[in-house]
Amino acid sequence: MAEPSPSTTVPAKRGFIAAPWHTLSILLFFAYMVFSGANHASAAVSAAGPVSQAALIRGYLLSIFFGFGMAYWCWAGVHWKGGTLRDLTGGRWTNWRSIATDVAVAIPFWVLWEITARLMHRLVNRVPAPTAPYQPPSGLLEVALWILVSVAAGIGEEIIFRGYLQKQFHAATRSLGTAVVLQGLVFGLMHAYQGWKQVMVIAPLGILYGALVAWRGNLRASMIAHAWSDLFEGWLKFL
């Protein structure tokens, strides 16, 4: 895999990129989401029936709002400390070659991600814990919204967890490896609404994303891989 180009990657700043109180506000909100999500998963398992289109669309819209809304809040915290969006993303594409490089990195990474996901699913399926049923999108409106959900996850969640939290955890612990693991655990817990089995699957996948970002020094390849993985796992593989 190619090394990141110095001209398109912004060196990570040392120290906190946002005030500790700002990070605490995010973690407290996430704690609320974890507990409410776990209750939602229990209710979904108990219902054990098809989800109405209205409920499905509402869930998609909330996911889109969460992805972009929380990414904006992360940017606001960095901005208040004098930083820019580049401090979160690590830089943007400047030419077609840099785009091709990141796509070339994202493709084999996604293969590794997919293998890891399948192995984790096999392991957790042995654990006797309920899992919320999944209903793939159907029809033009649901599919269009799911594409937006995938884009929001690829951009928003990478900014939130790898662009923001990973840097904050790194500043707090002085250990990049610890930061990668911590943000992955938080990332997994944020999917408690899907059931605890999914948390056990998604946390290692979040750690993989974090390792990719730590290696590349930017979010570009992870954004591509994340958006594609959500698009594939949530819709395309059911076609």
Briefly describe each language-model feature range.
Residues 154-162:
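Acidic (Asp/Glu-rich) catalytic motifs at the cytosolic membrane interface
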Residues 163-173, 235-238:
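Membrane-interfacial alpha-helical segments at the cytosolic side of multi-pass membrane proteins
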Residues 95-99, 139-143, 172-178, 195-196, ...:
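Membrane-helix interface segments
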Residues 1-96, 118, 122-123, 234-239:
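N-terminal, membrane-interfacial amphipathic/helix-forming hydrophobic leader that caps
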Residues 19-25, 55-63, 98-102, 142-146, ...:
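Residue-level signature of transmembrane alpha-helical entry/exit and packing/kink sites
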Residues 34-35, 66-70, 105, 109-113, ...:
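Alpha-helical transmembrane segments of multipass membrane proteins
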Residues 45-60, 83-153, 171:
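Juxtamembrane helix-loop-helix connectors linking adjacent transmembrane helices
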